[in-house]
Amino acid sequence: MQKKARKTRRQLLASKAAVQQQLINKANALTNPLETLDKFHEYITTDYTIKLSCIRAKDAQPECLSWIFDIMERNMKDMYEQSTWGWDAAEKQAELTEEMAWYLIASCNDKFLGFSHFRFDIDNGDVVLYCYELQLESEIRRKGLGRFMMSALESMAYQNQMLKIVLTVFKRNLSAIQFFYTLG
């Protein structure tokens, strides 16, 4: 009788990494990760009927990119300047338009109201949907849109077999900490 060869730790890790990369590649090969999630195409408040769309950052129209950079600077420049990272507009633009970046965009009547910048990635050995940004215009905050967008991201993560959503929040951004804490 022949003994079955046991895989070494290195072989097991290589096999796991290959499976993870296949999941990331499959998620990134999608045209629109939101497409089959019908309940996340529209969000209705008392004042707005908001459409959600999902596109690759590299496919975003110039007016969309311009608005994204503008809202990032309006909402986050001070936080970055107060951190050890500092604010570097060119570096932020490069991050926001990186090859693997996706946008979840909320708009109403051709007006941009919010966006999330995210990627399907590997973080600390896990396949994740990494939420780099969630930014809303001030007039739409505290109306449930941020929660709705995070639910859409969670559903996209689940649909694509990502283990979790990962994000980073500045310690000084108390409202964001409270928001994400309430989401669990």
Model-derived segments and spans:
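Acyl-donor-binding surface of acyltransferase catalytic domains
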Residues: M1-K51
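Conserved acetyl-CoA-binding loop-helix of GNAT-fold acetyltransferases
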Residues: R142-S155, Q178-T182
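Conserved beta-strand-loop-alpha-helix junction that forms the acyl-donor binding cleft
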Residues: L134, L167-I177
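Structural motif
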Residues: N160, T182-G184
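Active-site acidic-Proline motif in GNAT/NAT acetyltransferases
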Residues: E137-K143, K171-R172
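Conserved GNAT acetyl-CoA-binding A-motif
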Residues: A157-T168
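Polytopic endomembrane small-metabolite transporters, centered on the Drug/Metabolite Transporter
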Residues: Y80-Q82, N160, K171
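Acetyl-CoA-dependent GNAT
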Residues: Q20, K26, K39, Y43, ...
